[in-house]
């Protein structure tokens, strides 16, 4: 089976594909000649995909400008040019199936493949359907999804297949290499521990609330691993200079082996991107979610509310965030073992441990 994957711009579009590719490799499908990833030169995928040893090609495309509609004439022109580039790639590679996860590059590639009668499918990771996937839903053979709210947005009900997020299965296969928090950071493995992080670059709002809450948190009977993000680490370190933060708080720039750390955590404080949620639910980790307001269609809030509704998360909107509700939310989970266990069970019930296999099954069903 020859496969073209396409998607880009954000990790939520890229990591599900990388998880599927890893599973295909485990099944003996070579990344050398059977798999191709099509993205953009400027997107995050241009770094992640080649570094993983996966064949990578680019097409030139850009998103719609909602603030300056007149600039969208150029966007439409680029889209038409991109479909020509897509057709050339499709003719050369001759895929048996094309899978898109979102982003404008996905729109051009999957649309052109459908026009050429190549089997096509999309995967939607968020609870709010992105513009590209909403457009492609009319043309593809199958629509895979994670959240039930996303399924409601597609009128093409016969095409829908609930698969979960492929990142879930990948995380479960990785978490065997657990991090020894005592050996690595001198922390007590028998004490409740919370991980606070805002992604690899970090989140300003989360770092600010941590700085405001430190004097309270350092007196608590639990430990905190605070990953500031690489972008904010130096500025946080400057603000902490000469400040006694106690022995129960460890400040780091980022966590390299997240799947190895998550199983050791009693609770996590995080944004609510689709990839992060897939990791939390795969491992059944209770979470306090502070959704980013700076995302399209406020999809992080919708993702977070889905988890809260299931009893797997507490949600604090960024505008409502203050030291009182922040610390009391952490206390609620870390100091109430019964509640933490109930949250963990609810979280695990949402995870799909074989999500990659389910997506691959759909690929095999429709491939030519």
From Swiss-Prot:
Residues where UDP-N-acetyl-alpha-D-glucosamine binds: 10-12, 126, 200, 255, 300
Gene Ontology terms describing biological process: carbohydrate metabolic process; cell division; cell wall organization; lipid glycosylation; peptidoglycan biosynthetic process; regulation of cell shape
Keywords assigned by UniProt, alphabetized: Cell cycle, Cell division, Cell membrane, Cell shape, Cell wall biogenesis/degradation, Glycosyltransferase, Membrane, Peptidoglycan synthesis, Transferase
Enzyme class, first EC level, given as a word: transferase
Any one Gene Ontology cellular component term annotated for this protein: plasma membrane
Enzyme Commission identifier(s): 2.4.1.227
Membrane topology (UniProt): Peripheral membrane protein
Superkingdom: Bacteria
Molecular function per GO: undecaprenyldiphospho-muramoylpentapeptide beta-N-acetylglucosaminyltransferase activity
Pathway where it operates: Cell wall biogenesis; peptidoglycan biosynthesis
Pfam families hit by this protein: Glyco_tran_28_C (PF04101), Glyco_transf_28 (PF03033)
Catalytic activity: Mur2Ac(oyl-L-Ala-gamma-D-Glu-L-Lys-D-Ala-D-Ala)-di-trans,octa-cis-undecaprenyl diphosphate + UDP-N-acetyl-alpha-D-glucosamine = beta-D-GlcNAc-(1->4)-Mur2Ac(oyl-L-Ala-gamma-D-Glu-L-Lys-D-Ala-D-Ala)-di-trans,octa-cis-undecaprenyl diphosphate + UDP + H(+)
Cell location: Cell membrane
Function comment: Cell wall formation. Catalyzes the transfer of a GlcNAc subunit on undecaprenyl-pyrophosphoryl-MurNAc-pentapeptide (lipid intermediate I) to form undecaprenyl-pyrophosphoryl-MurNAc-(pentapeptide)GlcNAc (lipid intermediate II).
Family in the record: Belongs to the glycosyltransferase 28 family. MurG subfamily.
Record NCBIfam families: murG
Identification of the protein by name: UDP-N-acetylglucosamine--N-acetylmuramyl-(pentapeptide) pyrophosphoryl-undecaprenol N-acetylglucosamine transferase
Organism this protein belongs to: Lactobacillus helveticus (strain DPC 4571)
Lineage of origin: Bacteria, Bacillati, Bacillota, Bacilli, Lactobacillales
Gene: murG
